[in-house]
């Protein structure tokens, strides 16, 4: 067994749902084509460790994620849009530095991982809430799922982007119909 210490089905169900979402994502031929267009140089686990290795990256991701959390909790559209603009500005700046230091391939790889993990993580948490999971981390706004960018950062930012998209009324089926690679934030449309 992969996780022998997990014997409670309320913890297994969310993990299974997470992986099923990946299967659904790749069942869209256009999305599969877009994912195959990415060159993968580092393993997902290695890339998720970059914030621990590069303090400037961790700091930038915290700034981005804080903007996402503020946008999600904003009381009105104007306030939300201000935080979204800040997020997009921080993200653009960080990606430019990543492009300079790590290369375009790593940036695109991050974007592909974030897109893949965003909806999978969101559905994992939602299914955990539905089955009343015994795992204390399964709350919609837990530190583990919403803020811990030093570990699995593209899971965190992707999850929070999906939460923002739901608040904004963005169709969650968006990335699965294009054969072209696009960053998840490119689906944000604000005035």
Where do the model's predicted regions map?
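Short pre-active-site segment immediately N-terminal to the catalytic Zn-binding motif
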Residues: 1-16
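Acidic-enriched, low-complexity/disordered segments with a strong bias for Aspartate over Glutamate
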Residues: 5-8, 26, 46, 59, ...
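Active-site recognition of the HExxH zinc-binding catalytic motif
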Residues: 14-27
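Post-HExxH zinc-binding segment in Zn-dependent metallohydrolases
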Residues: 27-102, 106-136
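Pan-zinc metallopeptidase signature
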Residues: 89-191
